Amino acid sequence: LGEEIAYLKIKSFNVSNIKNDREKLHAWFKENAEKKIIIDITRNGGGTDSYWQELIVAPNINKPLESVSYYLTPFGEGTQEQLKLDGVNEGTLDSDLDKLYNLPGLNWDDLEGISGFGTTMRRVSPAFDKAVCSGPFYLLVGPNAYSSADGFAMFCKNTKFATVVGENTGGDGGGRNVCVVKLPVSGLLLRFRAMHVLNPDGSSNVESGTVPDVV
């Protein structure tokens, strides 16, 4: 790739990798502090947002960065208790769906059965007095970048931490934790998100994923 470019591929943001990867990544960023950084998450199936917030973004920024996303939810009876544990309740939801009508990509069918919408904010503060890398950063994504990997792509696009390059992600980032219910007959446990995350233009993140800056 040349002496001015450094390439890093991260296959997972699994929470169990944070401890082992923290020092490795910090050393790698210091070694390549003056280079253009390419981070490849094209086959990253996700894990936890804490991974990319603490190990990638925080060491390489000089000021706090914030990314806000909308989500829709029916706030159904079967998921209210779990959503409340995650900070979602009647007080945090806005029932005035008319406020979303100015979003050009919104599919009105997505509002059927929805009782309100809320916002999720991802805020990352600098880890050090000075960023380790001077950048710029480029994030490679594709349809296999999913969950928290998509959340990272969404964050990069919204905050300009990195230029997002590639194909649409697999989506499902930017929301809260999943809910778990027990099926009454089989007893099987079902995991799902009781919310529908929107991209900044109102389009469905679940259906479209995050659209790169450069395709």
Language-model-detected regions and their locations in the chain:
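C-terminal "post-core" interaction segments
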Residues: 1-215
